[in-house]
């Protein structure tokens, strides 16, 4: 819980800094943070090192500085990450990046979602479904598609914290419950 609060505060601070400069800087910061978070995801030993109190802030700062040099991030993100190192907050980079992405999407009027189907959809069908959902939402939609044969048929749509389960599996579950209750 505390980590989430810390991550949100730092993400909002970086976002406010980028917002003063314009949308291009907001996106640059987001891309740089995403690259850094992706690198940390592939190297979990770095995250463990950032969380380990045995390493001094200077040692952590040196490691993150070398990593940032390799990633060629913008100076603002570099200074931001070095500040995180000084304040012993490097362990929150991935959470900061995730929340920053949410803020950036809100600024651009984009909502993210995922559509789960029982079979793979053709590209034309994907585009049509996405266009219909965008029309209903009135906003741009970044929609990921995945396949889960366990839903048997229909779709499960996840957008933000909402889930619309129109799968055959869910319908059969409702029918089963109704039969058990004698309705």
From Swiss-Prot:
The keyword Phosphoprotein does not apply. The keyword Cell inner membrane applies. InterPro entries: ATP_synth_OSCP/delta_N_sf, ATPase_OSCP/d_CS, ATPase_OSCP/dsu. Its main location: membrane. GO terms for molecular function: proton-transporting ATP synthase activity, rotational mechanism. GO terms for cellular component: plasma membrane; proton-transporting ATP synthase complex. It comes from the Bacteria. F(1)F(0) ATP synthase produces ATP from ADP in the presence of a proton or sodium gradient. F-type ATPases consist of two structural domains, F(1) containing the extramembraneous catalytic core and F(0) containing the membrane proton channel, linked together by a central stalk and a peripheral stalk. During catalysis, ATP synthesis in the catalytic domain of F(1) is coupled via a rotary mechanism of the central stalk subunits to proton translocation. F-type ATPases have 2 components, F(1) - the catalytic core - and F(0) - the membrane proton channel. F(1) has five subunits: alpha(3), beta(3), gamma(1), delta(1), epsilon(1). F(0) has three main subunits: a(1), b(2) and c(10-14). The alpha and beta chains form an alternating ring which encloses part of the gamma chain. F(1) is attached to F(0) by a central stalk formed by the gamma and epsilon chains, while a peripheral stalk is formed by the delta and b chains. Belongs to the ATPase delta chain family. NCBIfam families: ATP_synt_delta. HAMAP family: ATP_synth_delta_bact. This is ATP synthase subunit delta.
């Amino acid at each position: 819980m505390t980590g989430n609060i810390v991550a949100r505060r730092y993400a909002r601070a970086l976002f406010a800094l980028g917002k003063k400069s314009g949308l291009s800087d907001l996106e640059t910061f987001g891309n740089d943070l995403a690259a850094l978070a992706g690198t940390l995801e592939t190297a979990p030993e770095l995250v463990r090192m950032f969380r380990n109190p045995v390493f001094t802030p200077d040692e952590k700062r040196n490691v993150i500085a070398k990593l940032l040099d390799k990633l060629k991030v913008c100076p603002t993100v570099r200074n931001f990450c070095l500040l995180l190192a000084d304040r012993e907050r490097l362990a929150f980079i991935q959470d900061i990046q995730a929340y920053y992405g949410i803020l950036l999407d809100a600024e651009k009027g984009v909502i993210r979602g995922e559509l789960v189907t029982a079979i793979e959809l053709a590209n034309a069908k994907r585009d049509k479904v996405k266009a219909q959902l965008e029309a209903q939402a009135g906003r741009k939609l970044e929609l990921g598609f995945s396949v889960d044969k366990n839903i048997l048929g229909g779709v499960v749509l996840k957008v933000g914290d909402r889930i619309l389960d129109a799968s055959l599996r869910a319908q059969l579950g409702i029918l089963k419950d109704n039969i058990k209750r004698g309705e």
